[in-house]
Amino acid sequence: EQPAADEALAAGESLRESAAFDLVLSGVGAFPSTMRPRVLWIGATEGASELMAAAERLRAALEQRGFKLEERKFRPHLTLGRVRPQGEGGAKRALAVIPSGELARCTVRGACLMQSVLGGRSGATHTVVRMFPFR
């Protein structure tokens, strides 16, 4: 596992070539759909192309190191949370009341590699493994 982790960290260094950019988050949705929400998200509007360019840079670096990558297209978003099947009704109500306009604006100055460890009833624990500041 350690050689793969080292290769992933090396690929992450490619993100340092990205420039800082402004990001606007607006509009909410759900994966796989709003009728069957499992993940709630806020979409990235302004700054989405910069996010996609950074993701493509990382994809290329990972692919070059032999990692098998997802085939589905990257969709820039901020995950709000996961929905258990029994919480579907509440998630649908939340989607209906969250405003559709601009919800947040920030400057993105870097990316983090995160480690997520599932913890049963308490949910996942997320830890920053390494930060990759943008130029």
Language model regions located:
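Histidine-dependent nucleotide/RNA phosphoesterase domain, centered on the 2H-phosphoesterase fold
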Residues: 1-135
